Every structure is written in structure tokens, then in C-alpha cells.
């Protein structure tokens, strides 16, 4: 898939609703922060040096040995994309919101299936990311590590024997690894257990964020849980610790769902079918309303209240209904009211198409 196809297609591998524990865990991500020796960190990187870093990365990912190990990788400069197309990459979780600033200094490397992405000149020179559906942290780590090893054979990393990999943010020094899982936790929210859960996670040294990471709220009952510190821990320890916590959250969420199904079945059915009805027939719909209703419908699908709707379609609708993607599909900039109308139209069409498939 070319970059232009990537920003025109709501599909992404991590949206498939496959993989272990996929009824609760939407996706797993491993990200490695790396910097090139001999260059300032990106926040003080001039345009000339930024170009040199981009060129070095472009040359490295084109090497036959790396391509044979992990598949076809291609670097694109952010200036090759419109502002809307850059925002779509954020909406698909392929780049961070910070990448929208100073596009002339930045680039992104993508594999065709979007499982691998590398942000160039974001907070660090390289942010190697692997993103897979369900609970697949070990698989993400193995793939990200393969990319990292391949690049390290070509590029000199900034590394110190005592500290490990040197990074722009002190919390990333050491392994430079940030692992995270995205979870759908509607039952813990509905049973008002979520605050206690979040408090426990914080005490365990984990960070909880919303759908789009730092600074975002947990809309649609979607929560990102990640490690905070990398220094003093091995990569395997970080991954294993997060897997243990993720499985505990899966157990708690499923228990809460069973309790709701047993004790409040009529209320749950009403909530789910109301959400489905609004999504299928409403003529305007805000972004936040869409996220709430899609969460309710996904819960209904997972509980067996609604049948015939693949969970992956619900995840696809989350991306399809985001502001930049709406403008891309429409082929024009839309004001908020126009977006609400077009969002409702696209959702209706997609849900109605399921009955014809």
C-alpha cells in the first residue's frame, strides 16, 4: 500500500479485531526511541542536520538486508502530504500529533500493512513502532527489535554504557522502550470500578491515556495503558509486566460484563439497540457522540446482543468518522456542522452495506 493509499483507506491491520483477548484488548504497541550519534536532539536540530538524518534513515531502510528481514519499508517526507493527510496518519495511530509541527524537518517510514512505522525527527531521531491487533506485545517487541537490530548495523546510535540508549526525554533513557495496550473497558466504566482500577495502575508505575495518547481523554471507553520508566529494566521485563497487568484488566472487564449481562440485561439491551438505531438512522452526529455509540455497539457485539456485525467494522468506523478522514473522503474542508452531517451519512451507508454483503 502506497502512502497515498494509506491516507485514503480507513483500514489498518491493528483495527482487525483479531489476536488474543481481542474482545477487550484492541491493540498492542511497542515503540523504541533511538537517536543518531553526532547529531543534536530534534528539538534543537537545524534544517541542514534534519535533512542529513532523513537521508541517513532513507538510505538505511532501503538496504536489502533490512527489507528481507521485515518487509518493504519506504520513507516519505511529511511535506509530501497535505495537512489533512498528515492528520489522517495521526488518526490511524501511525504518527504522533507532534509530527504535525515543522513538517519540513520530519518524515515517516511505513511498511505496506502499517504494522511497522518509524517517525523520523519527532521527539527523538527515530521512533520505531510496531502495532498489532489484540494482545500481541511479545510479537510487537520481536518485530520492533528486528527492525532496530537491522538499523543499528547501518546507523550509529547514541548509546552510553552506563545509561543505555540516550533519548530526548529522561524517562526513555535505558532501553528506550515504551510498550502499551489499548483496551475497551465499557463495563468497568458502567459499574463505576474504573477509578479504582486507574488508581491501582498509577501505583504500579503505569500511565493511562486516551485514544490518541498523551493529553487526550478516554473517549469511547478506550484506554491506553503503558509503562512509564525504561531505565533499570530489560525489554523482556517491561513486556512481561505489562502483559500481566493487561490480562488482569481483561479478567476484571469480563467479570463486569458478566455481571451486567446477568443483573441488568434489559438495560444493556436497551442501551445497545438505542446506539445501533442512532448510528444507523441519525442525520447528524458529533465526534464524541459517535465514539460513545460505537462503544455501546461494540459491547453489544461482544455480549452477543447484536449479531452480524464484525467487530473490525466498528473499529474501522472510528477512523472513518474522524475529522481529517471525513474531509479527505469528501474532498473538501468541512466545518464542524458539515462534518457532523457527513459523519452520520458515512456511518449509515457502512452499516446498511452490511445487510447487503
Curated annotation (Swiss-Prot):
GO terms assigned for molecular function: ATP binding; creatine kinase activity; protein kinase activity
The entry's keywords: Allosteric enzyme, ATP-binding, Kinase, Nucleotide-binding, Transferase
Motif (RDXXRA motif of the pArg binding pocket involved in allosteric regulation): 339-344
Gene Ontology biological process terms from the UniProt entry: phosphocreatine biosynthetic process
Family annotation (PROSITE patterns): PHOSPHAGEN_KINASE, PHOSPHAGEN_KINASE_C
EC identifiers of the protein: 2.7.14.1
Reaction it catalyzes: L-arginyl-[protein] + ATP = N(omega)-phospho-L-arginyl-[protein] + ADP + H(+)
A cellular component annotation (GO) from this entry: extracellular space
InterPro entries given in the database record: Arg_Kinase, ATP-guanido_PTrfase, ATP-guanido_PTrfase_AS, ATP-guanido_PTrfase_cat, Gln_synth/guanido_kin_cat_dom
The keyword Ligase belongs to this UniProt entry's keyword annotation: no
Residue sites binding ATP per the record: 27-31, 93, 127, 178-182, 209-214
Pfam families (UniProt xref): ATP-gua_Ptrans (PF00217)
Top-level taxonomic group: Bacteria
Residue intervals of the Phosphagen kinase C-terminal domain: 24-256
This protein's record includes keyword Hydrolase: no
Activity: how regulated: Appears to be allosterically activated by the binding of pArg-containing polypeptides to the pArg-binding pocket localized in the C-terminal domain of McsB.
Family to which the UniProt record says this protein belongs: Belongs to the ATP:guanido phosphotransferase family.
Described function: Catalyzes the specific phosphorylation of arginine residues in proteins.
Name by which UniProt lists this protein: Protein-arginine kinase
Organism: Desulforamulus reducens (strain ATCC BAA-1160 / DSM 100696 / MI-1)
Gene name of the record: mcsB
Amino acid at each position: 500500500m502506497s502512502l497515498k493509499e494509506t491516507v485514503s483507506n480507513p483500514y489498518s491491520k491493528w483495527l482487525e479485531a483479531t489476536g488474543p483477548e481481542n474482545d477487550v484488548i484492541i491493540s498492542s504497541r511497542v515503540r523504541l526511541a533511538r537517536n543518531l550519534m553526532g547529531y543534536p536532539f530534534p528539538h534543537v536540530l537545524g534544517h541542514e542536520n534534519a535533512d542529513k538524518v532523513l537521508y541517513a534513515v532513507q538510505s538505511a531502510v532501503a538496504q536489502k538486508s533490512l527489507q528481507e528481514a521485515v518487509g518493504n519499508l519506504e520513507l516519505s517526507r511529511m511535506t509530501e502530504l497535505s495537512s489533512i493527510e498528515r492528520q489522517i496518519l495521526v488518526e490511524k495511530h501511525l504518527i504522533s500529533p507532534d509530527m504535525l509541527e515543522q513538517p519540513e524537518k520530519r518524515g515517516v517510514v511505513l511498511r505496506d500493512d502499517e504494522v511497522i512505522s518509524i517517525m523520523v525527527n519527532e521527539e527523538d531521531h527515530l521512533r520505531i513502532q510496531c502495532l498489532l491487533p489484540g494482545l500481541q506485545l511479545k510479537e510487537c517487541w520481536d518485530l520492533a527489535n528486528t527492525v532496530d537490530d537491522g538499523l543499528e548495523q547501518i546507523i550509529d546510535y547514541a548509546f552510553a554504557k552506563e545509561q543505555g540508549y540516550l533519548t530526548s526525554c529522561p524517562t526513555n533513557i535505558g532501553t528506550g522502550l515504551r510498550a502499551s495496550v489499548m483496551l475497551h473497558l465499557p463495563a468497568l466504566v458502567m459499574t463505576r470500578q474504573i477509578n479504582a482500577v486507574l488508581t491501582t495502575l498509577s501505583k504500579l508505575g503505569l500511565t493511562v491515556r486516551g485514544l490518541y495518547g498523551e493529553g487526550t481523554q478516554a473517549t469511547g471507553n478506550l484506554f491506553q495503558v503503558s509503562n512509564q520508566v525504561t531505565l533499570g529494566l530489560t525489554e523482556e521485563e517491561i513486556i512481561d509486566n505489562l502483559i500481566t497487568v493487561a490480562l488482569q484488566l481483561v479478567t476484571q472487564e469480563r467479570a463486569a460484563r458478566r455481571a451486567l449481562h446477568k443483573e441488568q440485561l434489559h438495560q444493556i439491551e436497551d442501551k445497545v439497540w438505542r446506539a445501533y438505531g442512532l448510528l444507523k438512522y441519525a442525520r447528524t452526529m458529533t465526534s464524541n457522540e459517535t465514539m460513545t455509540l460505537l462503544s455501546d455497539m461494540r459491547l453489544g457485539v461482544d455480549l452477543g446482543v447484536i449479531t452480524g456485525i464484525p467487530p473490525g467494522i466498528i473499529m474501522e468506523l472510528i477512523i472513518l468518522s474522524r475529522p481529517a478522514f471525513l474531509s479527505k473522503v469528501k474532498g473538501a474542508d468541512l466545518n464542524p456542522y458539515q462534518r457532523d452531517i457527513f459523519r452520520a451519512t458515512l456511518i449509515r451507508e457502512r452499516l446498511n452495506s452490511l445487510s447487503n454483503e
